[in-house]
Amino acid sequence: MHISTIPVSDIAKPNAPAAGAWQADDVLALYELPFMDLLYRAQQVHRQHFDASAIQLSSLLSIKTGGCPEDCAYCPQSAHYDTGLAADKLMPLEDVLQAARAAQAGGAQRFCMGAAWRSPKPHHLDEVAEMIRAVKALGLETCVTLGMLRDGQAEQLKEAGLDYYNHNLDTSPEFYGSIISTRTYQDRLDTLARVRDAGLNVCCGGIVGMGESRRERAGLIAQLASLDPYPESVPINNLVQVEGTPLAGTEALDPFEFVRTIAVARIVMPLARVRLSAGRETMSDTLQALCFLAGANSLFCGDVLLTTGNPQVEADQRLLERLGMHAEGALPALPQATPA
């Protein structure tokens, strides 16, 4: 399949190409389109399915920080690396609710809770289920990321009212072994299958800028797009380099390459929420605007994402206003009268 010969109207169809048909070469052909052509195509696809002026706001809270036994080379929460991050116990329910109310007041529609576990223990899952019920009662969509799930655990989360489960693939199968050794790619796919079988929505994306090649970035997007069905929510993270982790000092990704990744994700997963996630704190307003043009329609709001910095809510509000955009659920700003 030579992507450049396929009409935009065909690429935009949810079932075209068929599930499992996306190969890295197909996605790479999109990456290698001229930049303006790629953005034009992505914007066309985006407008077929979404209001291009609306952005979904999500909030992310670390409910259990640090001490993770995994060796993910990018992660400051790994117990394998000395990053100066102290391990905490599971956050009390009332503290979670306080953070959820603050996120809702800031315009967030979805509240995500993350715990630095390899896999949740049964008694921890009971506590997280209570958090889900309480946050859901506020009227927020709920999402959790707790590591690998065993049989029956996704069903327990579903019964508690969970909307989304996040479990990222991180990178392509080919590059994966360079980043993580303590869990396999198949482990991740198995958890995603359990989430789907339980009837939960899937939030699944990855990280770019870890030293991977463009082909390996294409491999990640192809893998995501070939999930059947592809994820409803696709967070794209730009590596945040943390001193003490093996990836500290990695050469930064070209900003235009990050925009290309957003555009390609939009084209091959036309109905997904493509979310700007970690790494946004160092992005200029111009770069973020290009990402919106490329089809990003969700972002994490709030000062901190798990353990890394993030733009302040007020800065996000000002940016959306300058671009004539608005948060989903909020009324668009009225146009200002021009002076006579």
Swiss-Prot record:
Cofactor(s) required for function per UniProt: [4Fe-4S] cluster; [2Fe-2S] cluster
Positions in coiled-coil regions: none
Pathway(s) it belongs to: Cofactor biosynthesis; biotin biosynthesis; biotin from 7,8-diaminononanoate: step 2/2
All copies of domain Radical SAM core, residue ranges: 53-280
Catalytic class of the enzyme: transferase
Catalytic activity: (4R,5S)-dethiobiotin + (sulfur carrier)-SH + 2 reduced [2Fe-2S]-[ferredoxin] + 2 S-adenosyl-L-methionine = (sulfur carrier)-H + biotin + 2 5'-deoxyadenosine + 2 L-methionine + 2 oxidized [2Fe-2S]-[ferredoxin]
Protein name: Biotin synthase
Species for this entry: Bordetella petrii (strain ATCC BAA-461 / DSM 12804 / CCUG 43448)
